[in-house]
Amino acid sequence: MVADLNRCVGCQTCTAACKHTNATPPGVQWRKVLDVEMGEYPNVERLFMPVGCQHCSDPPCMEVCPSTATGQRKDGIVTIDYDICIGCSYCAVACPYQARYKVETPRFAYGEQPTETEALRFDEGRIGVAQKCTFCSDRVDAGLARGLKPGVDPDATPACANACIANALTFGDLEDPDSNVSKLLTDNTWFRMHEELGTEPGFFYLWNEK
């Protein structure tokens, strides 16, 4: 995924779309937007930075998982098998991006009972185990099965990218040189979070420093 920080307006529509799609409980944001100050006075700039699981090529969360619940697909998406996860939270400690959550008891937006929308998407298997952004892998897989192209067809693209009003989030195949994400990285200046850690994130940021 590529986030264009030159375009992001900090509206957090991506956060809302993610919460609606995945029915994450209060306090859990698989996709959130940071309000960041860059530079030093008087040359200060403000930017908004979408963050979440970086779907690293060398994920430290997977390395420390004692139950092998954390895995990685061939397309690079880092996954969690809720049936195998023992809830030790080693992965949450190892993640340098603070992208993992653990919810011990069911929580809902308005009281003890879920709303109609929450009830449709509530997954009891996520209680007491690690959870995080999945890049809407179920949606991606369903789209691929129908011959759709992730990052091009909305029904094969993560909810956050579909919802972005500024077209700041772009999803696609990094191994395809003709994909939308590959072209963005070729034509623009980009960086990744905590490159120095060697995790090789699959989430890229475009930023033209003024």
Show where each model-derived region lies.
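Non-ligating segments of multi-cofactor redox enzymes
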Residues: M1-K210
